[in-house]
Amino acid sequence: MKKAAWIALLLMLCTALCACQKTTAAVPACRDAAAAVLASQETAEMTELSAKKIEKYLLIDETLYTDAAVCIDASRATAECVCVFTAKDGERLAAVQTALSDYCRAQLEQYRDYRPDEVPKLESALMKTRGMQTVLIVAPDADAAEAALDQIWNGQEKTK
């Protein structure tokens, strides 16, 4: 009888501990998140980068993420970009975030001399993370971009 009580107690404890386990937030596909942000903006013509070009321009290796969408100004005349990555794990997420921060800083230095009118966009660049998904947005209207991102993130949460 005592053995059965202990087993029941252990099962309840295991169930309670499993229920407290941290879950990752549901996130949309990177391409969907990028499209939502771009739809909120009046941007230059944007082009989506391949994994090879992501590694070349942003120094983010394909082994760090499970999904990505990076859209930049096709002409490179503006600093506008939407970079969305879903990392494989927390360690890789930190590496992606560091690379995005470095990219933004490098762009700021380049555009300071090349196109000083682009500097305010870079200075107000938005970097947000939800679960394993991190986003860098350099856009004409950072508030509208953030609202669009929050809307797709919250909409994704409601459907799960």
Question: Residue locations for each model-derived region?
Answer:
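A short, solvent-exposed beta-edge/loop patch
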Residues: 74, 117-158
